[in-house]
UniProtKB/Swiss-Prot annotation:
Pfam families: Anticodon_2, tRNA-synt_1c. Zn(2+) binds at C97, C99, C124, D126. It comes from Francisella tularensis subsp. novicida (strain U112). This is Glutamate--tRNA ligase. Its EC number is 6.1.1.17. The keyword Ligase applies.
Length: 468
């Protein structure tokens, strides 16, 4: 069975690069009716935090990238790692090393001063050293000293590294804890991982890991090293570009559908298709069409996709996110139009759900403030008479008539005729009075969504406060 994994380290938040790696791994598993494993690589005890673990799990849940089976934590598998280390020592494939930090530092300085390759010189490799109680030691892996490590990377093609370039890496630290490059191999073997899709910053780890696979007589999985994501300026993506906790994108009003759709196209293509549902992603995804070159993050493209999903999604598919953002504003959504109807009207005017909530606040809150520029531009000496006539005409409408935007639009038009002014001389002051600004959807739709009581109350208030 095809089995992939996403294995983040909880030393920081889940950012877009990690999300893309998780997405590619998840899609490949789903495309092949396989399994997708989530593993938290928390062996760095000093830097790993529960806050970061929670952020990773929250991000994966929000995006809908559900793992199969349990979530694995490396810190809960230390006994297993120590067991395998002892097997390697017993088989002569690993050894105890007593070299002090001072000796290793002197060795490094000597190598650098003489333009030699830096790395461990193998002093303890064949010394058959057995540590006595109280002695400090590490365990090193016996890397082959000749030959070449090669693999056919699913993204980068054939890669070969001479074993002469690799030293005997530490697989168990002096404090007894196992190291990253060793743990991941044991995990991937035990979890039957067949395909490892990860960032190309791991390419240099791969030959070391392949040698451990071979030492343990295990099958070497397929590796697919995905290029990094660059900022719009071509520099490495950083916080200033937006390499923030993926949950910040939620706070900024982006839909998970938009994030996933954007990231799947960031370094992977399927013809000219830009818009993908999750089902379409799963059906189309493969490793062959992952681009070997880095991609640049384009915020305008992400914003465009987000707008598309706000406009085109079934309301049921985005309702949770819409309600989340309205709740953040403190607006009482029971004091206004149905959110489904509101989104249909406002979607064309916003790029994010934050904008949606902000630009729609006047539908739900009676505490509106008037935009000074709009008041100055549209409220004139004659506006009071227009508001009086509008109130008279609106009061004459029954509940059924108020549900028809065309009827309401015609009332505004009729009022303009009665007052012998152009439509704009009525519509724009009316907008300011009922929304606080000169911008809103079509006036008939705006009146309908606000409802008769709100419109009459706000017109009355504007008549008193703006038309003195």
């Amino acid at each position: 069975m095809i089995t992939t994994r996403f294995a983040p380290s909880p030393t920081g938040f889940l950012h877009v690069g990690g999300v893309r790696t998780a997405l590619f791994s998840w899609l490949y598993a789903k495309n092949n009716n396989g399994k997708f494993i989530l593993r938290i690589e928390d062996t760095d005890l000093e830097r790993s935090t529960q806050e970061a673990v929670d952020a990773i799990l929250d991000g994966m849940s929000w995006l809908g990238l559900k793992n199969d089976g349990e979530i694995y934590y490396q810190t809960k598998r230390f006994d297993r790692y120590k067991e395998v280390i002892q097997e390697l020592i017993a088989d002569g494939k690993a050894y105890y090393c007593s070299c002090s930090k001072e000796r290793l530092e002197e060795l490094r300085e000597y190598q650098q001063a003489n333009n030699l390759k830096t790395g461990y010189d193998g002093k303890c490799r064949d010394a058959n050293y057995v540590p006595q109680q109280g002695e400090s030691y590490v365990v090193r892996f016996k890397n082959p000293q000749d030959g070449v490590v090669s693999w056919d990377d699913a993204v980068k093609g054939r890669i070969s590294i001479s074993n002469h370039e690799l030293d005997d890496m530490i697989i168990q630290r002096a404090d007894g804890s196992p190291t990253y490059n060793f743990c991941v191999v044991v995990d991937d073997i035990d979890m039957a991982i067949t395909h490892i899709i990860r960032g190309d910053d791991h390419v240099n780890n791969t030959p070391k890991q392949i040698n451990i696979y071979k030492a343990l007589n295990a099958n070497v999985p397929v590796f697919a090293h995905v290029p990094m994501i660059l900022g719009p300026d071509g520099a490495k993506l950083s916080k200033r570009h937006g390499a923030v906790n993926v949950m910040q994108y939620r706070e900024d009003g982006y839909l998970p559908q938009a994030i996933l759709n954007y990231l799947v196209r960031l370094g992977w293509s399927h013809g000219d298709q830009e818009i993908f549902s999750i089902e379409e992603m799963i059906k189309a995804f493969n490793l062959e069409h992952i681009n070997a070159s880095p991609s640049r993050f384009d915020f305008e493209k992400l914003k465009w996709l987000n707008k598309h999903y706000i406009k085109e999604s079934k309301f049921d598919d985005i309702q949770t996110e819409v309600e989340y953002h309205f709740a953040k504003t403190g607006l009482d959504i029971s004091n206004g139009p149905d959110l489904k109807e509101l989104v249909a009207v406002m979607a064309e005017k916003v790029d994010t759900l934050v904008e949606l909530a902000e630009k729609s606040s006047y539908f739900y809150s009676d505490d509106i403030s008037y935009d000074e520029n709009a008041v100055k531009k549209h409220i004139k000496a004659s506006t009071g008479e227009i508001f009086v006539k509008l109130l008279e005409n609106f009061e004459a409408l029954d509940a059924q008539q108020w549900q028809d935007p065309d009827v309401l639009h015609n009332i505004v038009s009729t009022t303009a005729e009665q007052c012998q002014v152009g439509m704009g001389k009525v519509g724009m002051p009316l907008r300011v009075a009922i929304t606080g600004s000169g911008q809103s959807p079509d006036i008939g739709i705006t009146l309908k969504l606000l409802g008769k009581n709100k419109v009459v109350a706000r017109l009355t208030k504007a008549l008193e406060e703006l038309c003195k």
